[in-house]
Regions:
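Rossmann-fold NAD(P)-binding glycine/threonine-rich loop
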Residues: 1-45
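Soluble or luminal CAZymes and related metallo-dependent hydrolases
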Residues: 4-11, 56, 223, 291
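Beta-sheet entry/capping signal
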Residues: 26-28, 49-50, 76
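A structural signal for short, well-ordered beta-strand segments and their strand-loop junctions
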Residues: 28-32, 52-54, 244
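An acidic- and aromatic-residue-enriched active-site/binding cleft used to recognize and process polar
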Residues: 33-35, 55-56, 80-82
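Acidic, His- and aromatic-enriched active-site or binding-groove loops in soluble protein domains
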Residues: 48-64
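Long, compositionally biased stretches enriched for glycine and/or charged residues
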Residues: 69-356
Length: 356
């Protein structure tokens, strides 16, 4: 999260300014993670028309429909929050809210996530269905213990998968085997998605032989490619529709500023995105949302200043960290030992430090 944000924010802003200059009426549909934070940076520091997308909410919506045995189009989920920090607070089956039925049924709840993430009684206490990333807030000690037990990290496993993929693709393409190359890539996607959260939840591995089979990624009804096409189709006016996206709040969530980027349902039509006003956030999550948004603003400031002190402050504010000494230690490990005493080295600093 924070390391990628520090490296990526300056690049994203630079690219957005180029779009702003060359095609000011264009929409920038941003896939870049951390999606909410990057969209916030672009929105705050350029005039580019930007919308951030993430497949996490719609994946959860489809999992709920599948667990209910109902068509996805008959199930409407009321979702609110920030990117990687959102909750479903209503599940409407043909217009009737059945979230209490969903929360009461362990068999349904077991099907909502690829790995066993949450104690079901916690979900019932909150009366909310969180997205998978809330695991790192609600079970952070367990996540860390599992990562230590596995002796690996998700990033390290993805790097290993990517290296293997590149080698396999090169061999296939050198042999003019394009069909095999596509099959290789599909197998890579299945291994990557099938192992998602296994390490943090179970000390599992992307290379375990017993990974659950995954649907064909090229025919799946969800995923980045699907939501990207749907959002772009809506923005052209071809298929106006409602999607959960990362957009300016514009009063939709009363707890945050109008220019804060929120992850919320929005009506999308030709050249317009209108967020749907949400009911007040449940008190159990208001503080978490506000503190995470404060972290996003602080991380953007650090990314642009190049200051290690600014970066440590952002990590201190982050609700999953919240301590100065570990923040400084992690930053030193990621970018080298540097006590700048407030000196601002500029946005290129983080990329140079990471490369070094």
């Amino acid at each position: 999260g924070v390391a990628k944000a520090l490296r990526t924010v300056p690049v994203a802003i630079e690219q957005a300014r180029m779009i702003e200059r060359l095609s000011p009426d264009a929409w920038l549909v941003s896939f870049t993670n951390p999606a909410g934070l990057i969209t916030q940076a672009i929105s705050a520091h350029t005039r580019a028309r930007v919308v951030g997308i993430c497949d996490t909410p719609v994946e959860l919506f489809h999992n709920i429909a599948r667990a209910l045995g109902e068509p996805a189009e008959d199930v409407e989920c009321e979702y609110v929050g920030l990117n990687h920090l959102g909750w479903i607070r209503a599940v409407r089956l043909r217009g009737v809210d059945i979230i209490d039925r969903v929360l009461a049924d362990d068999a349904i709840l077991r099907q909502l996530y690829l790995a066993p993430l949450f104690d079901f009684d916690m979900l019932r206490a909150l009366r909310l269905i969180p997205t998978e990333y809330l695991y790192f807030f609600y079970e952070r000690r367990r996540a860390l213990d599992n990562q230590r037990a596995s002796g690996a990290s998700r990033g390290g496993e993805i790097e290993r998968l990517n290296r293997s993929l590149i080698g396999d693709l090169r061999s296939r393409l050198d042999a003019s085997d394009t069909t095999g190359a596509v099959q290789t890539y599909a197998a890579y996607l299945a291994q990557r998605s099938g192992s998602y959260m296994k390490l943090e939840a179970e000390a599992g591995s992307a290379f375990a032989p017993d990974l659950a089979p995954q649907p064909d990624p090229f025919r799946a009804s969800t995923g980045y490619h699907r939501i990207a096409v749907d959002v772009m189709s809506a923005l052209t006016g071809a298929r106006p529709s409602r999607h959960v996206v990362n957009v300016r709040n514009q009063g939709a969530m009363a707890e945050l500023a109008d220019d804060d980027i929120v992850e919320i349902a929005a009506d999308i039509d030709r050249d317009r995105i209108v967020p749907i006003p949400a009911a007040p956030l449940p008190s159990a999550v208001q503080g978490l949302v506000r503190s995470f948004k404060a972290y996003e603003h602080a991380a953007i400031e650090a990314a642009l200043s190049g200051s290690h002190l600014d970066a440590c402050k952002a990590m201190l504010i982050h609700p999953a960290i919240g301590e100065w000494s570990p923040s400084r230690r992690m930053l030193d490990e990621l970018f080298g030992h540097e006590h700048d005493d407030g000196h601002c080295a500029g946005p290129a600093h983080w990329r140079a430090q990471a490369a070094g």
